Amino acid sequence: EDLAAVMNLFHQFRSQFKVQAFEMFTELALGYVLKHTDLQRPFETETPYYVLIEIENENDETLDAALGLLESGMESGAILDGTLSQTKEQSVQLWRLREDISEATSHYSPYKNDVSVRISEVPGFLTEMDQILKEDYPEFDVVWFGHIGDGNLHINILKPEGWNSDDFIEACHKVDDRLFGMIQAKGGSVSAEHGVGLVKKPYLHLTRSQTEIELMRQVR
C-alpha cells in the first residue's frame, strides 16, 4: 500500500528466503502497460505500489512459509491483495506486467533515467523526488519502477501532449539538476544500469571520485 510496506516486505522475504527478484512498479506504470498490451489487471484491487517477488523454491516448506508471510501481510493490511503463479504461463504473464513498462511508455517519448541509492534510502528518495516533480511539473506523468533488492530505480518522464520536444528536454534537464543533487546527498549513483552517456556526463562528479572517473575513461 505504501513504500514503507514495500520495504518491510522486502526485508522480511530477504531474511527468510533466497530472493531471486524483488521488483517494484507503480499503479501509473501498470496503467500504461494495460493500455498498450493485451494483459489483464492481476487482481481487482488498485494500489499505489506493486511488487513481483521470485524466490528459490527449495521444498514444500518454502512455499508454505512464503504463503504464510503473504497472508500475514494481508491480515495486517500491509498487503492489499496478491496472486501466486501456478504455471509457467502465469509466471510469464505476471512478469510481463513489469517487463513491458518500457515498451508501453515508449509511445510518449519518455525521458529516461536509471539511478541507484542505498536500499535504506529508497523510500525517502522516492517520496521526496515524487513530491518535487508534482510541485514543479504537475503536467508530467512520471513512471517509477525498479529493483528494490539493489536500489536500482528507473524513472521515465513522459512527454505531455502538446509539448514540443525541445521544451520537454529542457524541462527534464532541470529535473536532472534536482534529481542528481538528491542522489549525491544520499550517496547514490547517477547511472545504475545503462551507462553514463552524454546527458549524465556533467553530473558524474557528484557520485564518483576523480580517480574513479579517470579509470572509467581508461576502460572506455
Map each language-model feature to its residues.
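Noncatalytic alpha-helical scaffold of FAD-dependent oxidoreductases
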Residues: 1-220
